[in-house]
Amino acid sequence: MTRVLHILDHSLPAQSGYTFRTRAIMKAQMAMGWDVAGVTGVRHPLDGPDVETYDGLTFYRTKTVVSGRSPLKEWREVGALSAQLERVVAQYQPDILHSHSPVLNALAADRIAKRHGIPLLYEIRAFWEDAAVGNGTGTQDSFKYKVTRMLETRAVRRADAVAVICEG
């Protein structure tokens, strides 16, 4: 049986388009006979147990509290998620790592995928740097935009496969 470990920003029971899409993907994989689980990063918004099952889906939570200013805070988030992934991979023994945007998840997953020889799929749902420009919280000529774009490009190049939700 194929075992897929999803690396997520957040998940159910939080309610968002992101969590509903994740649920649909995981349920479709289960319908194919695959064993699936998820790991959420430190940005998951709800308190709860370290391992939570919701709607038949199991999620491992990264409970580390990360502080500091950008960009050190983001690197600490990647480190915390990598440490949690290391623990979960040892226990769960996945055949595939399926990392979902944002890029911080892909950076953490890449470390573990390379260390353990596990194929990595990176699913890009949006370029978060472009979304920041679109909603007025960032600019295209900013340092943060350029670094995020560089990290996205690196993540795509290092992944074994990439999935996108549109061609636009």
Model-derived segments and spans:
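Helix C-cap/helix->beta junction micro-motif
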Residues: M32, Y92, I112-H116
